[in-house]
Amino acid sequence: MSELTHVRADGSAHMVDVTAKAETSRTAVAEGFVRTRADVVDKLFTADLPKGDALPVARVAGIMGAKKTPEIIPLCHPLPLGKITVDFERLPDGVRIEASVKTRGVTGVEMEALTAVTTAALTVYDMIKAVDKMAVIDGVRVLAKTGGKSGDWSV
C-alpha cells in the first residue's frame, strides 16, 4: 500500500505532508445537476416554491460548503480560498450547477469545487422536495483544474 499517498504501510489513513510543496495559483471547476419536472423548474426559476427563493439560498450554501470542505472531508487540507462562485443554468428537466474555486496554496481545490456543487444541489433538493419528492441529483464531476504538479486539464 505504500504507493497510496493517504495510507500508511499498516493500512491506516493519514493526512499527507504538504509542507515542502510550493504555493501556486490553483483553480477547479465542477458541475452537477438537479433533475426535476418542468413545472418545478418554472417554480425554481420564478422563486415560487413553498420554502422560498431557492437559488440565492443554494448559492450561499454552496459557497459555505466549499469553505467547510476540510471539516467534512477528513483528509482535505484547509486552504485559504480566494474566490468561490456558484452559478445556475436553467434546463428543461432541471438545473445545472457550476462552481469555481480559486486559491493560492500547496494543494488543489477540486474537493472544494465538488463540495460547493453538491451542497448547492442538496439545498435545491431540500427546497423543491415539497413539490417533487422524486427529484434526482446527478452528474457531479470536476470539469477542469489548473495549477500544481499534475498541471492543467479539462474535460
Curated annotation (Swiss-Prot):
Residues at the active site: 126
Record GO biological process: Mo-molybdopterin cofactor biosynthetic process
Coiled-coil region: none
Annotated keywords: Lyase, Molybdenum cofactor biosynthesis
Residues that bind substrate: 75-77, 111-112
Pathway the protein takes part in: Cofactor biosynthesis; molybdopterin biosynthesis
Catalytic activity: (8S)-3',8-cyclo-7,8-dihydroguanosine 5'-triphosphate = cyclic pyranopterin phosphate + diphosphate
Enzyme Commission code(s) on record: 4.6.1.17
UniProt cross-references to SUPFAM superfamilies, sorted A to Z: Molybdenum cofactor biosynthesis protein C, MoaC (SSF55040)
Molecular function per GO: cyclic pyranopterin monophosphate synthase activity
InterPro entries xref list: MoaC, MoaC_bact/euk, MoaC_sf, MoCo_biosynth_MoaA/MoaC, Mopterin_CF_biosynth-C_dom
Function field: Catalyzes the conversion of (8S)-3',8-cyclo-7,8-dihydroguanosine 5'-triphosphate to cyclic pyranopterin monophosphate (cPMP).
SUBUNIT field: Homohexamer; trimer of dimers.
Family: Belongs to the MoaC family.
Protein name according to UniProt: Cyclic pyranopterin monophosphate synthase
Gene: moaC
